[in-house]
């Protein structure tokens, strides 16, 4: 669920609050082309959730563990898929922290142009 995703981000050394309104894809919804590697993490995360169809991605909880700086997801197949979407995004944020640009926090969606396919 979203709380667990936020906790994953925090445990990987980032603040979840940095990503709530960042770029064109971090936060609710998204449009246009991702503006940098950090925003692309959110784009890929949105695409991953989108592939799950009608599954309740935002409120379904799952089990995971942080071990040796990595994230291990639950074995339940559908919950594991959801956890993997969140795991990949949390690691992506950590790996791309150097691309984070505070000018893109609160970025207006009207500036998000073009198209990008999942």
UniProtKB/Swiss-Prot annotation:
Keywords: Calcium, Disulfide bond, Hydrolase, Lipid degradation, Lipid metabolism, Metal-binding, Secreted. CDD domains: PLA2c (cd00125). The active site is at 45, 86. It is found in: Secreted. InterPro entries: PLipase_A2, PLipase_A2_Asp_AS, PLipase_A2_dom, PLipase_A2_dom_sf, PLipase_A2_His_AS. Its EC number is 3.1.1.4. Its main location: secreted. One of its GO terms (cellular component) is extracellular region. The keyword Secreted applies. One of its GO terms (molecular function) is calcium-dependent phospholipase A2 activity. Six disulfide bonds are present. Ca(2+) binds at residues 25, 27, 29, 46. Binds 1 Ca(2+) ion. GO terms for biological process: arachidonate secretion; lipid catabolic process; phospholipid metabolic process. It is an enzyme of class 3 (hydrolase). The keyword Disulfide bond applies. PLA2 catalyzes the calcium-dependent hydrolysis of the 2-acyl groups in 3-sn-phosphoglycerides. Belongs to the phospholipase A2 family. Group II subfamily. D49 sub-subfamily. This is Acidic phospholipase A2. It comes from Bitis gabonica.
